[in-house]
């Protein structure tokens, strides 16, 4: 019975950890975001990886093996729906909440813990939601 309980807990932990998000490492994002389309080492030492899964493209920037910025696009270049934006923000909430700032051409969001911000607008010619870590002041 004890082994069965441990097995159930392991399965539940795996199922609940199925979503990747800001701050996660290569392995979790590789598993969650699908096929790697492109990987580039950038001049600043970060690594940019483009993933493709289902109808989405995920552009992720890694620093020190952790995701510090993620952009979410539709493969066809169409706009993300409000429901999709809400779902992606929720996945990157880290236990905090998001507040929206409406601007003329670009929508922006701030996380209540001050550790992340997001914008919805044009990235490389496509509509995208970009979530990025906000670095603390030294």
Stretches found by the model and what they are:
Residues 5-15:
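Bacterial N-terminal signal peptides
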Residues 10, 19, 75:
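Short, flexible active-site loop motifs that bind/organize anionic cofactors or intermediates
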Residues 14, 24, 33:
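Functionally constrained cores in energy, signaling, and assembly domains
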Residues 15-17, 79:
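N-terminal compositionally biased, intrinsically disordered segments and leader/signal-like regions
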Residues 19-28:
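Cleaved targeting-peptide boundary
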Residues 28-130, 135-137:
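A cross-family detector of function-defining hotspots
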């Amino acid at each position: 019975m004890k082994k069965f309980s441990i097995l159930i807990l392991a399965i539940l932990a795996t199922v609940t950890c199925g979503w990747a998000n800001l701050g996660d490492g290569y392995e979790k994002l590789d598993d969650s975001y699908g096929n790697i389309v492109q990987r580039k080492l950038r001049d600043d030492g970060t690594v940019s990886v483009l993933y493709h899964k289902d109808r989405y493209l995920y552009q992720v920037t890694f620093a020190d093996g952790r995701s510090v910025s993620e952009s979410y696009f539709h493969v066809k270049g169409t706009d993300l729906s409000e429901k999709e934006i809400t779902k992606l923000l929720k996945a990157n909430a880290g236990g905090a909440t998001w507040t929206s700032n409406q601007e003329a051409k670009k929508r922006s969001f701030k996380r209540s813990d001050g550790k992340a911000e997001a914008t919805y607008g044009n990235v490389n010619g496509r509509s995208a939601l970009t979530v990025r870590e906000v670095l603390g002041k030294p």
